[in-house]
């Protein structure tokens, strides 16, 4: 019931997030456990999870907000079509340390930002970000408990073809360190003690968020617009970020995560045993095809079906034969009637001709 309540609340607040500025919507939290004691427990993933984004996303697993996510054979396209579009998907499940691997192609365009965000309700955050005016670079960043007093935590790395080709971007997150990988190559490591002695180290249960947003929208702050490469040109839409595969590993096995106090320390998080409703939804087998259903039928049922089909075929053939015979008989009767009428007409003509011959006398006879 707690997980269901949380999903309902997140869905409702997802609509509210659509009304916020793109920056706020990307980092939205609806109940901060550092400020409130009655926040609902976080439903755990509690397992490994892989999904290919070339089919519709399960609405019981993912919350889509603030724009259109278009599905294609190659994956999901997060598209900015108009002002303030910032299509984003956010998992309903939470992971408490683990691995997030995303195969994606970032969007190009001045003022356009593509992002992968691992974020908790206390605003712990681990980021990948691409600025559309920098086609061969990717930025990594982190925040602890919403602390934005300093923006010197980010590091930028070269990545050829980030906006032309799909690449593998992976975060490995443990209580001791965070590692960022590009195409399986380690590019950055952040140790716990390096993040202000651990105070700014992301360490609380987090959702996974993928999205694109107009960092260069005129409504954003000047500093954000400058960081995004300048004002976005909405006349040049669409701007598209594409994702084809996502792998998530939760380091813990459990049903829910709860905060035992307001410290925000990972040691204060309780792991509640069980399996979450979301995990059950993920593990639910897909609908079976007709071929699979047929193979699973017992032999007696198959024989009965074949017999029924055979009976229907025989009945159909009998009906067709009956109709043919009936039609042929009707045709014969009609032909007989027409033939009798023809003979009668011929006899009448011959009789009239005989009478005429008897009455006709040649001139001079």
Swiss-Prot record:
Residues 1-25 form the signal peptide. Residues 324-365 are cytoplasmic. Keywords: Allergen, Cell wall biogenesis/degradation, Disulfide bond, Glycoprotein, Glycosidase, Glycosyltransferase, Hydrolase, Membrane, Signal, Transferase, Transmembrane, Transmembrane helix. One of its GO terms (molecular function) is hydrolase activity, hydrolyzing O-glycosyl compounds. Disulfide bonds join 31-39. GO terms for biological process: carbohydrate metabolic process; fungal-type cell wall organization. Gene3D superfamilies: 2.60.120.200. It comes from the Eukaryota. The keyword NAD does not apply. Glycans are attached at residues 48, 54, 63, 77, 147, 168. InterPro entries: ConA-like_dom_sf, GH16, Glycosyl_Hydrlase_16. It is a single-pass type I membrane protein. Its EC number is 3.2.1.14, 2.4.-.-. It is found in: Membrane. One of its GO terms (cellular component) is membrane. Residues 26-302 are extracellular. Chitin binds at residues 129, 209, 213. CDD domains: GH16_fungal_CRH1_transglycosylase (cd02183). Its main location: membrane. It catalyses: Random endo-hydrolysis of N-acetyl-beta-D-glucosaminide (1->4)-beta-linkages in chitin and chitodextrins. Residues 50-243 form the GH16 domain. PANTHER family: GLYCOSIDASE-RELATED, GLYCOSYL HYDROLASE-RELATED. Dual chitinase/transglycosylase that plays a role in cell wall architecture. Chitinase and transglycosylase activities are coupled. Required for the polysaccharide cross-linking at the septa and the cell wall. More specifically, transfers chitin to 1,6-beta-glucan in the cell wall. Plays an important role in fungal pathogenesis. Involved in cell wall assembly and regeneration, filamentation, and adherence to host cells. Belongs to the glycosyl hydrolase 16 family. CRH1 subfamily. This is Crh-like protein ARB_03382.
